[in-house]
Regions:
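Mid-to-C-terminal alpha-helical segments outside catalytic/metal-binding sites
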Residues: 124-158
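His/Asp/Glu-enriched short active-site or ligand-binding loop at hydrolase and phosphoryl-transfer sites
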Residues: 76-88
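Extended substrate/RNA-proximal surfaces in nucleic-acid metabolism proteins
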Residues: 1-78
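A C-terminal functional module that forms or caps the active site or interfaces directly
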Residues: 80, 94-95
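Active-site environment of divalent metal-dependent phosphoester hydrolases
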Residues: 58-62, 86-89, 115-119
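Glycine-centered helix-coil hinge/cap
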Residues: 91-94, 136-137
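Short acidic/histidine-rich active-site segments
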Residues: 106-122
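Active-site neighborhood of phospho(di)ester-bond hydrolases with catalytic His/Asp-centered motifs
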Residues: 52-54, 80-82, 109-112
Length: 158
């Protein structure tokens, strides 16, 4: 599987990064263990990349333990959730977990999960407005704008 091959790709510098930056987007299966997630994050970090864990609100290991989520951030990972989860479009539990991440200042990025714009219309504006209302404008600016711009700066795009 790709996850098993990840350390080899990273060591050979053949893994696709975000916009040519040092950031690597990691995605896991819903039931992957905390140990598995921790090992993958460690592998990415040990190869000099900066891991962003995508859809962190979908994984049982992170949702059931904000402490584990905090440990991942302490290791050097950044956490990303989907805007629809923040807005409560999927489950109440996902929305609650997203709120906990924001209150603990663990959330790094918000994504649209819009692989195409016909069937999954991005709702970033509504998400930014919601976060701004709940957490303040500066916080919303950081997770919706400043942190993503950090990736582009790292890639030399700006």
């Amino acid at each position: 599987s790709l996850h098993d091959a990840l350390p080899i790709f990273l060591e050979k510098r053949k893994y696709v990064t975000m916009a040519g930056s040092s950031y690597v987007l990691l995605e896991f299966s819903e039931g992957d263990s905390a140990q598995h997630i921790r090992e993958r994050v460690y592998n990415v970090l040990s190869c000099g990349y900066e891991p962003i864990i995508a859809h962190v609100e979908r994984y049982q290991a992170t949702v059931k333990s904000v402490g584990f989520s905090s440990d991942l951030v302490d290791m050097g990972a950044r956490l990303q959730v989907n805007v629809e989860s923040i807005l409560g479009k999927y489950t109440w539990g996902a929305k609650r977990y997203c709120r906990k991440l924001m209150k603990e200042d663990l959330l790094g990025f918000v994504g649209s999960d819009s692989h195409n714009t016909k069937t999954r219309i991005p709702n970033i504006g509504a998400g930014a407005a919601y976060v701004s209302k709940k957490m303040g404008e500066a916080y919303a600016e950081r997770i919706f704008h400043d942190n993503p711009m950090e990736i582009l700066r790292d890639a030399g795009e700006i």
